[in-house]
Amino acid sequence: MKYTSYFLALLLCGLLGFSGSYGQGQFFREIENLKEYFNASSPDVAKGGPLFSEILKNWKDESDKKIIQSQIVSFYFKLFENLKDNQVIQRSMDIIKQDMFQKFLNGSSEKLEDFKKLIQIPVDDLQIQRKAINELIKVMNDLSPKSNLRKRKRSQNLFRGRRASM
């Protein structure tokens, strides 16, 4: 798990970019600290291939990419939560989390709190499962209105175009 954690922290750097409120140099130093701590340069880290970069290659559209990135960011937040008591790497994780927070959640504390709540929901709890199934229709409806709205607007524009040319 230690090698995997380190490798994931390294991938985070490439996934989310290198700029941020702490600057490139600071961000790179913190990634290097994590690499050293987890011995991520060891050849056995590469066994089995990368965790996320191959998956990300399949997601070309920017809005689609956000979907998979949200799952990856969720993973990193869980990883950092599991390592929160490790004082040796705490500062590095805090800086990386802050940069991730700025890039992925646009610095919104409310979004961060909601995101944390979501990743903490236990999926093996029967009451949670029942609530989730109860809300499934609403969630599915929330997922689809944008595409229906676009189709409706496109249809209206086509209809208007026909009326104008008649």
Swiss-Prot record:
Glycosylation is annotated at N39, N106
One GO term in the molecular function aspect is: cytokine activity
Signal sequence segment: 1-23
The UniProt entry's GO CC annotations, sorted and at most eight, read: extracellular space
Disulfide bonds, which pairs?
none
Coarse class of the protein's main subcellular location: secreted
Any one of the GO BP annotations: negative regulation of interleukin-17 production
Looking at the record's lineage, which domain of life comes first?
Eukaryota
Query: Which Pfam families does the protein's record reference?
Result: IFN-gamma
- Keyword Membrane, does the record have it? no
Tissue expression as described in the entry: Released primarily from activated T lymphocytes.
User: Pyrrolidone carboxylic acid: which positions carry it?
Assistant: Q24
Keyword field: Antiviral defense, Cytokine, Glycoprotein, Growth regulation, Pyrrolidone carboxylic acid, Secreted, Signal
Where found, per UniProt?
Secreted
Kindly state the subunit structure of this protein: Homodimer. Interacts with IFNGR1 (via extracellular domain); this interaction promotes IFNGR1 dimerization.
UniProt lists the family membership as follows: Belongs to the type II (or gamma) interferon family.
Q: Which PANTHER family does the UniProt record give?
A: INTERFERON GAMMA (PTHR11419:SF0)
Q: What does this protein do?
A: Type II interferon produced by immune cells such as T-cells and NK cells that plays crucial roles in antimicrobial, antiviral, and antitumor responses by activating effector immune cells and enhancing antigen presentation. Primarily signals through the JAK-STAT pathway after interaction with its receptor IFNGR1 to affect gene regulation. Upon IFNG binding, IFNGR1 intracellular domain opens out to allow association of downstream signaling components JAK2, JAK1 and STAT1, leading to STAT1 activation, nuclear translocation and transcription of IFNG-regulated genes.
**Under which name does UniProt file this protein?**
Interferon gamma
